[in-house]
């Protein structure tokens, strides 16, 4: 673990999941550290990389709390570890594959002064990104491309999100196996908490995966989400969904016509 500054009570905890981000981690953490100013902010990186990312963080960012995680952890599980170790009144979540805009922390703190329990932001792609980078972006993040109007939301990507701690504490039972944002957001809405999607908080996606790595990640994330969701559904209903699953491509096609 890195040597870190002593912060009695952080106002904001920035929790970053980190997987094989040696090409972007320095720019990501460098930008966040520039924005700390006089605010009491802690930065926690939970990393399970095999490409030297941990060594870069330990060498160049001594004021960052580096938590080393096992190689089999998914990004939402890394977030969960970091959130459990955080102490801020507010918690911002992203990954080391994203470079925050220069006003990222200021806008997060501003939006957290409102009544929203959670706030999601815009995600842009690096203009110099390659074919795979753009494919990943359009598959996963195009919904959050600028411009768009601010709106009350049901869900948003945790790759650019922030929350009030007391809001997360109210749904902490959903985070026993990691911070899977869809599940967390559904629980927050059931508790009558408000969520906001805003264009004022922006991050930029950099090359995050190889094509093979992204396909593997999507498969295992989908499997984990499906397993978690199915565990709360009666066996008879699961069987019915399984029998009807061949209709999914046709239903999706009709929706998008």
Give, region by region, the residue ranges found by the protein language model.
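Active-site-adjacent helix/loop segment of glycosyltransferases
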Residues: 204-254
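Short, acidic, metal-binding catalytic loop of nucleotide-sugar glycosyltransferases
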Residues: 30-40
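N-proximal low-complexity "stem/linker" segments adjacent to membrane-targeting elements
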Residues: 1-31
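Short aromatic/hydrophobic "clamp" motif used to bind/position activated sugar donors
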Residues: 91
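Acidic donor-binding loop at a coil-to-helix junction in glycosyltransferase catalytic cores
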Residues: 177-186
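Glycine-rich, basic loop-to-helix element that forms the pyrophosphate-binding segment
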Residues: 69-86, 183
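Conserved donor NDP-sugar-binding/catalytic core segment of glycosyltransferases
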Residues: 103-132
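A conserved acidic beta->alpha catalytic loop
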Residues: 31, 46-55, 98
């Amino acid at each position: 673990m890195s040597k870190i500054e002593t912060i009695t009570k952080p106002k904001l905890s920035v929790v970053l999941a980190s997987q094989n981000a040696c090409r972007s981690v320095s720019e990501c953490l460098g930008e966040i550290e520039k924005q700390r100013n006089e605010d009491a902010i802690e930065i926690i990186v939970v990393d399970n990389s095999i490409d030297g990312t941990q060594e870069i963080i330990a060498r160049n960012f001594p004021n960052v709390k580096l938590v080393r995680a096992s190689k089999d952890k998914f990004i939402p599980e890394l977030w969960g570890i970091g959130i459990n170790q955080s102490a801020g009144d507010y918690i911002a979540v992203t990954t080391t594959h994203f470079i925050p805009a220069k006003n990222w922390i200021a806008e997060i703190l501003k939006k957290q002064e409102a009544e929203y329990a959670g706030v999601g932001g815009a995600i842009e792609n690096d203009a110099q990104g390659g074919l795979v980078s753009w494919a990943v972006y359009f598959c996963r993040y195009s919904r959050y491309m600028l411009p768009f109007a601010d709106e009350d939301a049901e869900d948003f990507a945790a790759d650019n999100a922030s929350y009030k701690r007391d809001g997360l504490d109210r749904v902490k039972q959903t985070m026993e196996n990691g911070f899977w944002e869809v599940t967390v957001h559904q629980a927050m809405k059931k508790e009558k908490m408000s969520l906001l999607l805003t264009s004022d908080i922006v991050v930029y996606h950099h090359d995050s995966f190889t094509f093979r790595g992204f396909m593997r990640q999507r498969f295992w994330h989908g499997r984990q989400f499906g397993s978690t969701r199915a565990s709360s559904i009666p066996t008879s209903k699961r069987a019915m969904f399984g029998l009807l699953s061949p209709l999914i491509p046709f239903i999706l096609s009709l929706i998008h016509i």
